[in-house]
Amino acid sequence: VGSEMCIRDRIDGAQSSLRVHIYEFLSPDVTHALLDALGRGIEVTLVLEEGILDSSSVSNSQRGHASVLDEAGALVYWMVDPSGMSSPFTYIHSKIILRDSDQVWISSGNIKDSSLPPDGESGNREWSVFIDSEEVAAIFSSWLSWDEDHEKRYIREHGSWAYPSLGWELPPMSGTQSTDPTSRETLTNQASITPILCPDNCLIEIIGAIDASVDSLEISAQYLDVDWYWGEGDDSPLLGAIKRAAERGVDVRILLNAFYADDETWSLVDTVNAEWNDDQGLNATARLMSTSDRITKLHNKGMIVDGETVLVGSMNWGSSAMLRNREHGAIITSQSVASQFLASFNEDWDRVDERTDTDGDTLPDMWELIHGLDRDRASVAGTALSEQSLDPDGDGLDNRMEFLLGGEPFNQDTDGDCIRDGDEWEFATQSLRPESAAIASGDVNQNGVDDGLEFGCTVDGDVVPDPNPEENQNQTTDEDE
């Protein structure tokens, strides 16, 4: 999560030029900052995606921001799908700003409130970096110039065709004065930086960094495609490189977005945690990121290798991003830089909430951790049984029902009233109370009599009261004799 102040500060410091290539450009604060820059005589250039995958209102808003800047003197271009031919790129999905000739901002997040939340608001987990280097800036500058050439058929100048609907107005600034909630420390040490560009060299460079891993590999990504939908072959070369690393003994951790988790996501989690880890003995774990009050979902696309190399960029971990989109990123080798991102990764890795379910077994990670179950795997190692179907305490309720009713999976009698959790339903029915209330209360009908005395004790090892005492009052038990 970052603040718009991070970018606004850098925009305010521009001396000659600002070049913004972005998929979604929707931040009023950043637009106002660029308007101020134009007022100071700064040359501002934007390249935006014409066909964003979002609602019509969002597309209209993007056109509004672009039109305001165009009217103020900015050079605004759109990447389009030209008629009569295919564009070389499906989308411009970049998140990059080049300031003057010596500084680059690269991010996983768009310029919008969900990626750059105003002060006090929640947003996505994103990774961003400012790089102060004339050499690196020159490389990115040459790449940006290629996509700023409106003579190319897939680049179109802003015009009336891209105006917003009548009545659209630029929202006011948020007034936030926040700072980046993670470190804003400037790291002045030397770093090795490899600029990457999709579809040109990004896949080769990312796989190369994974193949060079020796000790550890952390991946923080919105998603990781198992199937390779574009290009040659059906299997993801990224996933193949990750598995090769695990087979070399590298400690692999994969953190994925839980917000849009689907069957493919849980299939990948099961592949890594069950097949790679349990069956093949590889030290690899996949997990879904839990949320917090400040972080709503994982929108990142990053990687850390051996605690000293970090990938920051706009490219998702799938074939479309790597082979069909225009994307920008950087692989930075510096232990002090990587440590900042590793601290963020570990925070996300360890956090739990009440909803996230990594293994898809319908038991939230937090509940499984509290009760000593496995948050990362749905099936029981060496069996075909699912963890949710087990009844470890033998009280007649499987783990799924224990969770739903508020019971404890390793305690036959959660409320200590001498009635097994699995028998509470009968007493709850008699008392006209929900079963969940009976499991949690020793006096569910609030009559001052302990439920175990009123209904009869059913916990294993105790004598169950005779339902027909008058018929059997003259009989003796083994204990009497």
For the regions a protein language model found, what residue spans apply to each?
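Short, solvent-exposed loop/turn segments at secondary-structure boundaries
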Residues: 57-58, 229-233
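Charged helix-capping and loop-helix junction motifs
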Residues: 233-239
